[in-house]
Regions:
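A broad, low-specificity signal marking well-ordered, structured residues that form hydrophobic/aromatic
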Residues: 3, 86, 187, 248
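Active-site helix-to-loop segments that bind/position phosphate- or nucleotide-bearing substrates
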Residues: 4-95
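Short hydrophobic beta-strand segments
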Residues: 2-6, 164-167
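Internal, well-folded beta-alpha domain core
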Residues: 93-243
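Extended, charged low-complexity segments
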Residues: 243-252
Length: 252
């Protein structure tokens, strides 16, 4: 099984790491091409390009100037312990037993506007560059187009015939994958909550649930669709009436 998730805007470079293990990102050559473009942007340009405040633009301009390779444990940090958003709250990687890290490393991939595709223990430096950013790179009109061939080829290389491919990323990030070119079908779980008597997808809960689904897969060694349907963390249950084919809906 392979799983893809989105990165997070929030980063944590302070928390003590539970392991000294790390790996090298696969696409630093391509990341340097993207970085060269974004490094040239002034704070005001970053603010407009990313629709962020002047304060955030200044922070990310500084990050862009300081970003450099090679990555080492002294100047970079494993991705799964660095991203700090709702998905990562649900995943709670810090409490995954170290003997399960190899399972996480094998199954999980993180889509990224700067790094393309990251393994959990891949080193990364601080950045902010969402996949939907309308920024031409090399011959590509945007980041989706730049990364799509590389990311899709990498996933196909890793996916074995008959293996499940679970999409827990946002639409913005998953659009960097050429679904038609994948050699296996895509399983897409969705998570909905009852609120005021109506079933809704509430962003915070849905993002956290995506992370919890990754954790469930790691905890239970899930391999089949039936295994996925057993997801029951924090009150979610599989809803057979709302689900159809490879679209799995969980409600609570």
């Amino acid at each position: 099984m392979k799983i893809v998730i989105s990165p997070a805007k929030s980063l944590n470079f302070e928390k003590e790491l539970p392991t000294s293990q790390y790996t090298e990102p696969s696409f630093l050559k391509e990341a340097r091409i993207v970085h060269k473009v974004v490094k040239q942007k002034k704070p005001a340009e970053l603010s407009e390009l990313m629709s962020i405040s002047d304060k955030l633009a200044d922070l990310n301009w500084k990050r862009n100037q300081e970003w450099k390779t090679p990555f080492t444990p002294e100047n970079a940090r494993p991705a799964v312990y660095t991203f700090d958003g709702d998905v990562y709250t649900g995943l709670d990687a810090y409490t995954i037993p170290l003997e399960k890290l190899n399972v996480l490393q094998d199954k999980l991939r993180i889509l990224s506007g700067l790094y393309g595709l990251l393994k959990p223990l891949d080193l990364m430096q601080a950045y902010r560059l969402e996949m939907g950013t309308k920024m031409p790179v090399a011959e590509s009109k945007n980041l989706h187009d730049f990364w799509k061939p590389t990311v899709t080829k990498a996933l196909n290389k890793e996916l074995k015939k008959g293996e499940l491919f679970v999409n827990l990323a946002s639409n913005e990030y998953f659009s960097a994958v050429d679904v038609k070119a994948l050699k296996v079908p895509v399983i897409t779980p969705d998570f909905k909550d009852y609120k005021d008597g109506k079933l809704k997808m509430i962003s915070f809960f849905a993002k956290k649930a995506r992370g919890m689904m990754v954790r469930y897969i790691i905890d239970t060694n899930a391999e089949t669709i039936d295994d996925l349907k057993g997801f029951n963390y924090e009150g979610y249950q599989f809803d057979a009436n709302l689900s159809k084919g490879n679209h799995l809906v969980f409600t609570r």
